[in-house]
Amino acid sequence: MSKIIGIDLGTTNSAVAVLEGTESKIIANPEGNRTTPSVVSFKNGEIIVGDAAKRQAVTNPDTVISIKSKMGTSEKVAANGKEYTPQEISAMILQYLKGYAEDYLGEKVTKAVITVPAYFNDAQRQATKDAGKIAGLEVERIVNEPTAAALAYGLDKTDKEEKILVFDLGGGTFDVSILELGDGVFDVLATAGDNKLGGDDFDQKIIDFLVAEFKKENGIDLSQDKMALQRLKDAAEKAKKDLSGVTQTQISLPFITAGAAGPLHLEMSLSRAKFDDLTRDLVERTKVPVRQALSDAGLSLSEIDEVILVGGSTRIPAVVEAVKAETGKEPNKSVNPDEVVAMGAAIQGGVITGDVKDVVLLDVTPLSLGIETMGGVFTKLIDRNTTIPTSKSQVFSTAADNQPAVDIHVLQGERPMAADNKTLGRFQLTDIPAAPRGIPQIEVTFDIDKNGIVSVKAKDLGTQKEQHIVIKSNDGLSEEEIERMMKDAEANAEADAKRKEEVDLKNEVDQAIFATEKTIKETEGKGFDTERDAAQTALDELKKAQESGDLDDMKAKLEALNEKAQALAVKMYEQAAAAQQAQAGAEGAADTGSTNSGDDVVDGEFTEK
């Protein structure tokens, strides 16, 4: 069975891992980094992903960041003169990760396990699966990020029973999951979270502070300047990271804008104490889901054996201190918070292929599911933190006499009124026989699969007629749209490969021209004019092809030049070898002469008087 890669598709950074033997290994990107910025930019018709895209974010307005925060919505992003869905942008990131995983493995990759925040709703999960499909990946499993982290942490501890709390604060989302580990079973007891809390919010607090201070000093609002804002974002992210290791950092942004008197510079120092003060409310918000998860799991703090920190934002000292204060435990630092989720996803891939034995993953649904009933009430059929996959049925009836149809309004959430929860979809069961209200028996069945994706069935028990739908939110993509986007993604991949081939050829041509010109110059007057003239002719032909830009012609002329240049090089080598041989012969003769010179010596006679 082909390898199943594990992908952590993050808000700020993404990572890809693969199982090698029994070990999960992070695959470095082409720049040698173990995580890849979740950034996509467009330039001259080219799609740029990762580090290169992030580097040009300041100067390129066609750059998209933090797209994960828009997953599961109908919001589109404008770039490159087009509008893209969040699924399409995410697919570009996935395609890039897939590409360098294939380079590393030396084989095609078609299957993946992709992680999502535990608190992602059905629409967001479906959007993630669609993004994988567009990228040419069969998504074998959607796994919750804290659960994946627990897999990576606990794989070598399957003989030990313990309860762990996973505190996962990423770039844009926050989750807390409580799991019980033992005998190879990873059982999620409860999960809670906040999909609108992450490292981006900490960055924003610094940005707001810098904007306010600069406005106070210079009377100019930098938040209205897109380029300045991107520079502020980069500086804020760097300052946040710096303050995890030092107590004070300098923020220096020369020529940030211009005033009436000329260019203005932003120079400010930010202390860790000030940063903690700015972000205090965000740190406080992390405490509520911790308490909620413990309550839902029915556990006290004393029953938690380990606290695992996941996500780059857990490096913030105030966050670490808050976790210590809230749990009464020193966090376990045995896992890399940036890499552990992708590693866990790869392990789950190994479970699917059978390479990892005796491991069972029991995940839960993060939010309650149900339907709208009379009076706009939300009636739950499946409670949050129910182990998945699961199925639950309940019988309902009509609200009016002779009602011919019932509308099934499917919802996800925790609020008592339907209007306050997230609509997953609507469908209708028709042709109900005329009868007084309360008589028809309508059975509604909810199914949640292992990926947390919902399907709903309504059945008239009297006529046995039923209606069944897999929930596709109003913000989701149709099969036709996914198909079109897949073709676009494939076309882009082909175009990118062709563009790379073109660049490589042009570089090869430049190198060949430079090397041949150097050789021709060095061989002037050395006696092999035939080969030099042939190389010069081939060189001139290649230069003409280079000017025309015809790739096929360039390729043909490059081969011709290489042949002539090779012939010239052979002649040079032969001449050099002959000269070396002649020199060696001359030196040998000289040595022989000096050895024989003793034969001409005449002995003199000495007479004593």
Curated annotation (Swiss-Prot):
PROSITE patterns: HSP70_1, HSP70_2, HSP70_3. Residues 600-609 have a biased composition (Acidic residues). Acts as a chaperone. The keyword Phosphoprotein applies. Residues 576-609 are annotated as: Disordered. Belongs to the heat shock protein 70 family. GO terms for molecular function: ATP binding; ATP-dependent protein folding chaperone; unfolded protein binding. It comes from Streptococcus equi subsp. equi (strain 4047). InterPro entries: ATPase_NBD, Chaperone_DnaK, Heat_shock_70_CS, HSP70_C_sf, HSP70_peptide-bd_sf, Hsp_70_fam. NCBIfam families: PRK00290.1 (NF001413), prok_dnaK (TIGR02350). It holds the Pfam family HSP70. This is Chaperone protein DnaK. Residues 576-590 have a biased composition (Low complexity). Induction: By stress conditions e.g. heat shock. Keywords: ATP-binding, Chaperone, Nucleotide-binding, Phosphoprotein, Stress response. The modification Phosphothreonine is found at residue 173. Gene3D superfamilies: 1.20.1270.10, 3.30.420.40, Actin, Chain A, domain 4, Substrate Binding Domain Of DNAk, Chain A, domain 1.
